Amino acid sequence: MKIPPICCVITQLPQAETLKKSEGAAFYELRLDLLGENWRETAVLLNKPFMATCRRSAEGGSFKGNEAERINRLEKAASAGAFMLDIEYSTPNLEEVLGRLRPQAKCLLSHHNFTDTPSAAKLKTLLKDMLTHQADIYKVITTATSINDNINLLNLTKEIPDKKIVAFAMGEPGILSRILCPLAGSPFTYASLNDGNKSASGQMTLAQMIEIYRSVNYANHT
């Protein structure tokens, strides 16, 4: 059965049995800020590639160290096998950080808006600003306050067709864009390993996402 690539988010040390149920994932995202020192043990358990993310509190995470420590943790993740690193657009000295990390792993440049979803024009301007920095994938995530907000995010991926752009909205009203973003051009979408691993509002479990794609016969729509 064909389904879109799904990045399965892991926020706590998983049981081996739980990982066996995640075969439908294309790869994992390890939340280094939430896993703490357990991230290394978790990485060893994985049977698929993984991306590493280490969020500051301002970006919805829990990392309490300084920036040097945060970047160092991402470097350690790359050394441990992470094929991609999520770097926030708000990162201080962004160009320097990207220059330091890109030789070690692919970089996904991300922006998160935890308040609302800006207009289509503002999102386009934001994306163009992000594209002035060299990255492998660009991610724009907002918070939906209405169903209509999904449209702005789904259309955003079409603005620069030659770039890889992940765009969807958080929150219950944004679930639609989480499901449909691969059909709109996003290279992948996100899901949690299970209910205990959810890292954002509106995030569905991997099993739920797979069941939805199976129900609508996703392969016939691509």
Swiss-Prot record:
Its EC number is 4.2.1.10. Pathway: Metabolic intermediate biosynthesis; chorismate biosynthesis; chorismate from D-erythrose 4-phosphate and phosphoenolpyruvate: step 3/7. Keywords: Amino-acid biosynthesis, Aromatic amino acid biosynthesis, Lyase, Schiff base. The keyword Zinc does not apply. 3-dehydroquinate binds at residues 29-31, 55, 178, 199, 203. It catalyses: 3-dehydroquinate = 3-dehydroshikimate + H2O. GO terms for molecular function: 3-dehydroquinate dehydratase activity. It comes from the Bacteria. One of its GO terms (biological process) is amino acid biosynthetic process. CDD domains: DHQase_I (cd00502). Gene3D superfamilies: Aldolase class I. It is an enzyme of class 4 (lyase). The keyword Signal does not apply. The active site is at 112 (proton donor/acceptor), 139 (schiff-base intermediate with substrate). Involved in the third step of the chorismate pathway, which leads to the biosynthesis of aromatic amino acids. Catalyzes the cis-dehydration of 3-dehydroquinate (DHQ) and introduces the first double bond of the aromatic ring to yield 3-dehydroshikimate. PANTHER family: 3-DEHYDROQUINATE DEHYDRATASE. Belongs to the type-I 3-dehydroquinase family. Homodimer. This is 3-dehydroquinate dehydratase. It comes from Dehalococcoides mccartyi (strain ATCC BAA-2100 / JCM 16839 / KCTC 5957 / BAV1). The gene is aroD.
